[in-house]
């Protein structure tokens, strides 16, 4: 069910780590998406996932520079986000394999009233009220 992402300029988007990683690795379609966004937000969890993927100190430095160049806003994990994520894990871990990181990212998106941009729609399909656009690397 993946499709190219289409959004109206001005949409509040929060990006999943997959889109950031593709842009960082030079995928033009992902980079163009970031360039066309009015603002780029990510969950603190997405930030940590991105940093964990660094292969060495030089790449860690390059990731930080990449985030700075795109003026990425990192959204903190608040008590409200924690509570909502706990409910998602409790409700969907067994039935839909809801993972901790995905629950926190979904809760961050909902709490901040932002649309989640991801290529991993199946990770989030069970989350009610989550606005999501799917992205496919071309």
What feature does the model see in each segment?
Residues 43, 47, 60-63, 82, ...:
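A general structural signal for well-ordered alpha-helical segments in protein cores
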Residues 1-42, 52-65, 138:
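Short, well-structured N-terminal submotif of metal-dependent ribonuclease cores
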